[in-house]
Amino acid sequence: MLARMNPSKVIGLVALAEKPGLGEALRIMRRELSRHGLGSCVIETPDALEQAIVRCSMLVTFGGDGTMLTVSSLAAAHHVPLAGVNLGRLGFMTTCSVQELPLLAYALQEGSFLTDERSMLEVVRMGVDGIAVPPRKLALNEVSLIRAQSGKMVDLDAEIDGE
């Protein structure tokens, strides 16, 4: 269980894709967070997310699993907890529905929630000299590798916990 949210920081509300019901969901969440004394900021682009994440004590994504996957690597790199509001159909990874936003805001204010640490995949491209070439990338669930040129062999090493 986590302690109360840091009042000097804000809850980042991440809305990267226009979805039906998004505007209403953001309005409800901002109202509920304000009722509980928590500040918030709406983040609508990946560039804005990279700038805002340092001010956020928590990120709440609005969309579905795709939005969660998009945001997860940056959240993990900054050690910022992530919750998801399902605006789509399935939302296996999301935390709650729009109807549950008042409960989510209350839980954030009270610190009455648990975090589930997920294993992340780290992708590192190595140069011919054996030195890592920046940037390293984090991913949740899966990684796709694509050859730069067709007809060439790909040399791939995979490690799990250094083995």
Located regions from the model:
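Short amphipathic alpha-helical segments
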Residues: A25-R27, S72-A75, T95-S97
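Proline-centered loop/turn at the N-terminus of a beta-strand
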Residues: H79-P81
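Catalytic core of DAGKc-family lipid kinases
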Residues: L90-E163
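ATP/NTP phosphate-donor binding region
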Residues: M1-M58, F62, Q99-L114, R125-K137
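Short glycine-/small-residue-rich flexible loop motifs, especially phosphate/cofactor-binding loops
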Residues: R30, S72, D155
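Short, solvent-exposed amphipathic alpha-helical segments in soluble enzyme
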Residues: R27-E32, A76-A77, I160-D161
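Divalent-cation-assisted or electrostatically stabilized phosphate/pyrophosphate-binding catalytic cores
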Residues: N86
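Short glycine/serine/threonine-rich phosphate/pyrophosphate-binding segments
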Residues: G66-V71
